Amino acid sequence: MKPTTSILALLLPAISARFVQETDGDHVQLHPEVAEAEKFHIELAPGETRWVTEEEKWELRRNGQRFFDITSTPELGKTLRSQSRPAAVFPSKLSQQDAVKPLLKKLAKEPMQKHLEKFTSFHTRYYKSEYGRQSSQWLLSEVNKTIADADAHKHGVHVQHFEHSWGQNSVIATIPGKSKSTIVVGAHQDSINLFLPSILAAPGADDDGSGIVTTLEALRVLLTSDELAGGKLENTVEFHWYSAEEGGLLGSQAIFSTYEKQKRDIKAMLQQDMTGFIQRTIDAGKPESVGVIVDYVDPALTEFIKTVIDEYCDIPYVETECGYACSDHASASKAGYPSAFVIESSFDLSDNHIHTTDDKIKFLSFDHMLQHAKMTTAFVYELASTDFKKLENESQGMSEL
């Protein structure tokens, strides 16, 4: 939908009615004071930036334009990008089938449906709203419950808020490994109605409630693994549930900006944004599949994910593109970390109900979400088990031959 006239521009005048009287003898002047709308610095493509009002941000989004809001994170990526770093290396073959396949049998649709019914019951999860704050609090408590049910706190597994100034906090769960090298899985918790974000309902069942419950189910099952939950695997694992993705990847930028400054060793980041809608694929006469994004991602990590899908999922993948800054993986990429993104289908056949009051559970397939949960579970376990130092040394040795 591409309306030519902005609804908010008609409803919300930008002029203040305040006047100031100045007196100099018999001389009186009345000066209308114009209230300047707050401006935000956005990046629409690499190096292409502009200053816009918040309403102009939503107008761009209504017209299908994605962007980083870099107002608070102008330096993101400058540290790591300035360093000479070897290309990321990932296993050419999978090795954890004996551990992973029993875990996949534990994944279930019922917990995902229960969680999504609750998550979509908030009027909106708009990141500046009280509902957005409440939904983040609920998510934190639910992740804490998941950890407690697995008795994983005793191994140092924990969850905490990553606080933001706008009210809705991001949520990060950590499963310690033998090293500080970290595998990240992400999804975004906020929803938005692009016509009146502060007022209209935004159930956000698919965008990105589906990604939230998919990753939450993967976490539940992974914590049943004594090897992973007990910290016996090579690498640390983090699950991220980002705030304010819809506002320009604000939450994920804040997190990866912090990680960059801390010189965190993030080996891989996988984003799960929209995992449940298949109807347009079926209507087009095409087979059910997952969409592997191939633009603005790490090529080696993306190839690795294809092997994971081939080995552990029951449906194939299709290659597809989503453009610049299309979801939170872009923040990891900009910070210099290898990232990838898998969506529910070919991008052109993805959910057309998003960002409206109609993004509802009734349009989604929990069987399809289960395929994303399988991929996520396998991705985490395989990479958590990978000795990256050994892999990188072997790769360097081969390149010197």
UniProtKB/Swiss-Prot annotation:
Any Gene Ontology biological process: proteolysis
Sequence positions that bind Zn(2+) 2: D207, E246, H355
CDD domains per the UniProt record, alphabetical: M28_AAP (cd03879)
A Pfam family reported for this protein in Swiss-Prot or TrEMBL: Peptidase_M28
Disulfide bonds: C322-C326
One of the record's GO cellular component terms: extracellular region
Annotated binding of Zn(2+) 1, by residue: H188, D207, D273
Cofactor note: Binds 2 Zn(2+) ions per subunit.
Cell compartments where the protein resides: Secreted
Single GO term (MF): aminopeptidase activity
InterPro entries named in the record: M28_fam, Peptidase_M28
Domain of life: Eukaryota
Sugar-modified residues: N144, N393
Segment forming the signal sequence: 1-17
Cofactor(s) essential for the protein: Zn(2+)
Record EC number: 3.4.11.-
Main location: secreted
Propeptide: 18-87
Keyword vocabulary terms for this entry: Aminopeptidase, Disulfide bond, Glycoprotein, Hydrolase, Metal-binding, Protease, Secreted, Signal, Zinc, Zymogen
Described function: Extracellular aminopeptidase that allows assimilation of proteinaceous substrates.
Subunit and interaction comment: Monomer.
The family this protein is said to belong to: Belongs to the peptidase M28 family. M28E subfamily.
Protein's name according to its UniProt entry: Leucine aminopeptidase 1
Organism the protein comes from: Pyricularia oryzae (strain 70-15 / ATCC MYA-4617 / FGSC 8958)
